[in-house]
Swiss-Prot record:
Organism encoding this protein: Klebsiella pneumoniae
Swiss-Prot/TrEMBL keywords: Ribonucleoprotein, Ribosomal protein, RNA-binding, rRNA-binding
Gene Ontology CC entries for this record: ribonucleoprotein complex; ribosome
Biological function: Forms part of the ribosomal stalk, playing a central role in the interaction of the ribosome with GTP-bound translation factors.
Protein name: Large ribosomal subunit protein uL10
Similarity field: Belongs to the universal ribosomal protein uL10 family.
Source organism superkingdom: Bacteria
GO MF terms held by the record: rRNA binding
Keyword hit for RNA-binding: yes
Amino acid sequence: MALNLQDKQAIVAEVSEVAKGAL
Protein backbone atom coordinates (compact mmCIF):
# COMPACT_ATOMS: atom_id res chain seq x y z
CA MET A 1 0.00 0.00 0.00
CA ALA A 2 1.62 3.21 -1.15
CA LEU A 3 1.33 6.31 0.97
CA ASN A 4 1.05 9.68 -0.68
CA LEU A 5 3.38 12.53 0.26
CA GLN A 6 0.94 14.17 2.69
CA ASP A 7 0.48 10.90 4.57
CA LYS A 8 4.24 10.47 4.86
CA GLN A 9 4.64 14.03 6.14
CA ALA A 10 1.89 13.48 8.71
CA ILE A 11 3.54 10.27 9.93
CA VAL A 12 6.93 11.98 10.16
CA ALA A 13 5.35 14.81 12.16
CA GLU A 14 3.74 12.36 14.58
CA VAL A 15 6.94 10.37 15.02
CA SER A 16 8.86 13.59 15.61
CA GLU A 17 6.41 14.62 18.34
CA VAL A 18 6.68 11.20 19.99
CA ALA A 19 10.46 11.35 19.80
CA LYS A 20 10.49 14.79 21.43
CA GLY A 21 8.24 13.48 24.20
CA ALA A 22 10.53 10.50 24.75
CA LEU A 23 13.64 12.63 25.18
